[in-house]
């Protein structure tokens, strides 16, 4: 019997002959399972604006503790109506735009909401519960590096960073060849000592 190659020798011979595949632009919603060919970079800062990490009230931290009038209510997806003035608060939803002038958000659990005013019994630290603009990523930062296979986590991060399409390697074409004199395809009559070939289907699936 001819000498068999070791696994290391087989890997070396294969890698010596491998050539990188060309890349193509792929829409993000068709990129699952593809391999990134160039670093994919954020289109926008993430978050793209200072946002609230909690449902609560945007305040100036030095105005706490105390009872503050509620000047406005900020829903997610809507801009703040104006700058927050000294001595007032604005109700804010998780993900809402923190108004200029505010430097903290105090969660609902820690206040007494009187509809038109809010009672805050403890001081809150500057920057508490505020996600600063670009705190996760800045525009131009690498979101997914070259060579990474795209799964749900990577696709979600790319979508959040505003990436609509990206360069991916073209899909490789491969053939599976199974050998053995004892092998027969399913559906044929087995002879003495023969078995049905199953590994090819497993590898190709």
Per-segment meaning from a language model:
Residues 1-68, 116, 132:
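Short, low-complexity N-terminal leaders and the immediately following helix N-cap/first helix
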Residues 2, 13, 40, 58-205:
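Short, glycine/charged-enriched hinge/interface segments at domain edges or termini
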């Amino acid at each position: 019997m001819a000498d068999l190659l070791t696994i290391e020798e087989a890997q070396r011979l294969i890698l010596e002959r491998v050539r990188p595949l060309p890349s193509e632009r792929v829409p993000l919603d068709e990129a699952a399972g593809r391999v990134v060919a160039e670093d994919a970079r954020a289109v926008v800062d993430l978050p793209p604006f200072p946002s609230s990490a909690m449902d609560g009230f945007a305040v100036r931290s030095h105005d706490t503790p105390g009872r503050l009038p509620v000047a406005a209510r900020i829903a997610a997806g809507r801009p703040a109506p104006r700058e927050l003035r000294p001595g007032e608060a604005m109700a804010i939803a998780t993900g809402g735009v923190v108004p200029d002038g505010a430097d903290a958000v105090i969660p609902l659990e820690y206040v007494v909401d009187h509809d038109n005013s809010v009672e805050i019994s403890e001081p809150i630290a500057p920057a508490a519960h505020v996600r600063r603009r670009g705190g996760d990523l800045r525009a131009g930062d690498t979101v997914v590096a070259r060579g990474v296979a795209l799964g749900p986590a990577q696709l979600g991060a790319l979508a959040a960073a505003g990436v609509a399409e990206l360069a991916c390697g073209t899909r490789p074409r491969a053939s599976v060849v199974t050998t053995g004199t004892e092998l027969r395809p399913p559906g044929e009559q087995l002879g003495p000592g023969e078995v049905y070939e199953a590994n090819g289907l497993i590898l190709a699936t």
